[in-house]
Amino acid sequence: MVNTSLLAALTAYAVAVAAAPTAPQVKGFSVNQVAVPKGVYRHPAAQLAKAYGKYHATVPTQVAAAAAATGSVTTNPTSNDEEYITQVTVGDDTLGLDFDTGSADLWVFSSQTPSSERSGHDYYTPGSSAQKIDGATWSISYGDGSSASGDVYKDKVTVGGVSYDSQAVESAEKVSSEFTQDTENDGLLGLAFSSINTVQPTPQKTFFDNVKSSLSEPIFAVALKHNAPGVYDFGYTDSSKYTGSITYTDVDNSQGFWSFTADGYSIGSDSSSDSITGIADTGTTLLLLDDSIVDAYYEQVNGASYDSSQGGYVFPSSASLPDFSVTIGDYTATVPGEYISFADVGNGQTFGGIQSNSGIGFSIFGDVFLKSQYVVFDASGPRLGFAAQA
């Protein structure tokens, strides 16, 4: 006799499996950043304030004052006023998003965003493939005053030709002027660990967490560039993009970040065996370190000083900058001095790309550092791999 209860259960299971969202099996894929002119100029102190706020640290008074006093102004773009975004298809719409290894949300400008706030942006319109998650909301805010919030949908998201049909898409209903004025950036795609996704009441998985099982390896590699668009490789490493071998180190993801410890550091020819614990964050522009390291670095730069009116260390634009290196196992990752010359702040002065992490509690290895390296983010460890860019 056929067990009808068992048959019904098996049938229901088969239907559920068939209906579950899946990503096609692929070996790997790459997505290139696109260089776009910035629509606004923001003082570098605003970048520093944003990093403090991102990690829920109090923004130092002088940094906040410098960022607030300068604000944002429209500027004619120049070769030095570019930012780098990546094209992503969300539902039926193609948007330019920031890929951010320091957060775990995929949020976008949308048709729900007031028209005055989305002017100049490409935006997501939930269509027939979208399914709203009832009761789900999200909200982010940063120390520079930027913020966004809204509802959540499940929809098809395609990155580099690979799609996931039921990705959580955080649709912006409110967006602050800091995001609104950046008309080339239509949102963010987070690549940190899903445990820090901000959707309430139930956090959602990142795009990478959803597709990693379909890749030949559960990894992505980042090759950001100095004054040029970079590339993200998903599922594989590209030996043409780095020299030597890749050195790996363990990741502590207990706080949801790609956190690692460097065994020591060097400033020019001076070295220290003091370790540095920090996170690899493509969504933070600067390299933020302990005060003792920052002070030691600028002691080697003629004319450098902490300028409270600028909210950080500045130096004469003609100054020669030493390299900064960290030791990871047997590997030395070196940031050329020229990469640390971050932004002109007038009067022949330049804002440094190395600044204080005071109050954050750990260091931030942002783009100033990452642009010198080919970095592998390996979820199987988890671990990080480093090699010099080719």
Swiss-Prot record:
SUPFAM superfamilies recorded: Acid proteases (SSF50630)
GO biological process per UniProt: proteolysis
Domain Peptidase A1: 84-387
Subcellular location: Secreted
Membrane spanning stretches: none
GO cellular component: extracellular region
EC number: 3.4.23.18
Record's keyword terms, sorted: Aspartyl protease, Hydrolase, Protease, Secreted, Signal, Zymogen
Record field: temperature dependence: Optimum temperature is 60 degrees Celsius.
pH-activity relationship: Optimum pH is 2-4. Stable from pH 2 to pH 6.
Active site: D100, D281
Reaction catalysis annotation: Hydrolysis of proteins with broad specificity. Generally favors hydrophobic residues in P1 and P1', but also accepts Lys in P1, which leads to activation of trypsinogen. Does not clot milk
Lineage top rank: taxon: Eukaryota
Protein family (similarity comment): Belongs to the peptidase A1 family.
Assembly with partners or alone: Monomer.
Note: Used in Japanese cuisine. During the fermentation process of Katsuobushi - dried, smoked and fermented meat of the skipjack tuna (bonito) Katsuwonus pelamis - aspartic protease plays a role in the decolorisation of Katsuobushi from a dark reddish-brown to pale pink by the hydrolysis of heme proteins. The change in color gives Katsuobushi a higher ranking and price.
PANTHER family linked to this entry: ASPERGILLOPEPSIN-1-RELATED (PTHR47966:SF2), BETA-SITE APP-CLEAVING ENZYME, ISOFORM A-RELATED (PTHR47966)
Name of protein: Aspergillopepsin-1
Organism: Aspergillus pseudoglaucus
